[in-house]
Amino acid sequence: MANHTLAPEEDYDVLIVGDLNNSGTEQCPRDDATVLLAHVVPQLYTTVFLVGLLDNFWAVLILVKYKGLGHVENIYFLNLAISNLCFLLTLPFWAHATSHGGTLGHPMCIILVTLSSVGLHSEALFNALLILQSYLVLFHVSSFFSAARKVPCGIITSVLAWGVAILVTLPELLFHKSRVGTQQYPCLLSRPHFLSGKDTSWEHSLTVKTNLVVLLVPLLVFTVCFVLFLRTRKTLGSGDRKYDLAKLVFAIMVVFLLMWGPYNVALFLSTFKKFFSLSDCRSGSALDRSVQVTRVIASTHCCVNPLLCVLLDEAFRRHLCCCCRLGGDTARRPPEDPAHDRPREGLEQSTSV
């Protein structure tokens, strides 16, 4: 029979949990963070699910029905909304499992982990692609960059991004298992029987992978493009459509990094706490609490992007009003044909979502 070492200190759903049960280590008393989250998470996740489902649905509707997918930016925005929906679909199950316990079998655990992880990793990749695309729209007109702005290129890069997101999720499926009869940890990571009890390389690898894809790659792309943007922004006016696109895309990336960055940092410190001399009970308890709290906060991000579009993009607000106006002639207007748009006019579509 497989001899799994359970990892009890953290996370109800996805990514990494540590291992406090290694032999020879000090057994530390539990704090009340998990109990508190068990009361907060169900209501919070249910609210986020309802809000996120509604606003991401409107985002998809506006992109497909009104703006069309004739621009690479709109293709990336559509995939970004789909990524958020993948993540959103798991929240009611985590909320129910956290409040009732004993409801997740192993197949359901794997399905939820897959949706959650693929949604998160793909969102990080599409944020990076949007930053790169907005930079190309702003400053490059050569034939190579013009080819990169064509729809076939957008479709190919989207397929590749989804493929990468699925590939980096596969290792997590090997280590996740359900835990029946608990309200706190319905789905967690465990060490497979074929690894020795002292082998923590699998946990380190998963943490590094998560930090690399979700934090470091988007942060690197954002930093490079933002520095280049600051060096050349004087060539753009504040009312330029290209400037509006960049403002929206950079705002989306900043919010993503602010909400997911703390979780990735806390996760890294928790996993490598022995290397940072943070293995004592007090530090370990603080790290466990930080990972749990930052994870819950980060999970609410999946409903934020459409709200940013409403705040920052006039075209999105206009089309949203068209969607809500019953019987209006404007709402029945077919998607715009990019073949008849002038280059500057086409950028209006790029800023809509």
List the predicted regions and their residue ranges.
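Extracellular N-terminal segment of 7TM GPCRs
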Residues: 1-54, 193-201, 206-211
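Intrinsically disordered regulatory tails of 7TM GPCRs
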Residues: 1-29, 314-353
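Loop architecture of class A 7-transmembrane GPCRs
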Residues: 28-30, 105-113, 146-154, 167-216, ...
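Extracellular TM2-ECL1-early TM3 structural module of rhodopsin-like
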Residues: 37-43, 72-130, 137-148
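Helix-to-loop junction signature of class
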Residues: 45-49, 62, 86-101, 113, ...
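Cytoplasm-facing ends of alpha-helical transmembrane segments in multi-pass membrane proteins
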Residues: 53-64, 88-92, 118-142, 157-159, ...
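Intracellular effector-coupling site of seven-transmembrane GPCRs
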Residues: 158, 188-203, 207-214, 227-266, ...
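Seventh transmembrane helix
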Residues: 261, 265-267, 289-342
